[in-house]
Amino acid sequence: PVPNTWAKMLDILLFWAEKGIDGFRCDMAEMVPVEFWNWVIPKVKQAYDVCFIAEVYNPAEYRNYIWNGHFDYLYDKVGLYDTVRAVMCNQAPASNISGCWQSLEGIQHNMLNFLENHDEQRIASYFFAGDPRPGIPGMIVSAMMNTNPVMIYSGQELGEPGMDDEGFSGRDGRTTIFDYWSLASLRNWINE
């Protein structure tokens, strides 16, 4: 029998898809059994043309969540993101990037590349590069390395430093998602 929680989650996904949502980002998807995703994603996709993106940090599980879980894309955090960040911070040689795409043979097109998101420190923050310009070659690598999608996080295109004393986490080089907060760089760009 299908667990009651699974049926309720299906109802929630269908509710939002009916409202016009065209994709779901599933935070820490690997903490949910792949059997659930195997059951629910085809049911949602049968009714609506939606995209499913998963946050999965265990590379040994990537193929399982793509092939059995039916996810369209997975965040490439522990591969490309961590490697490009290390290169940008002079902690690793650029040649390490080759190993990223080599390890993803057959699924590279299912990986979502990014340099910033709500979990990671902003490139321009003092905790990362202290300047947005080192992000330019990193973004070129992320965007041009393959045919897979690339994500630009709100404010990244303007060099948002995320260095305000905001939210519960304080001054940590990240932009809060838990409180209403204004990105100074985005606000200034809009008002200019």
Regions found by a protein language model. Name each.
Residues 11-14, 22-111, 128, 132, ...:
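Active-site-proximal helices and loops of the catalytic beta/alpha 8
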Residues 123-127:
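Surface-exposed cleft-lining segments at the edges of enzyme active sites
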Residues 1-8:
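Active-site mouth loops of central-metabolism enzymes
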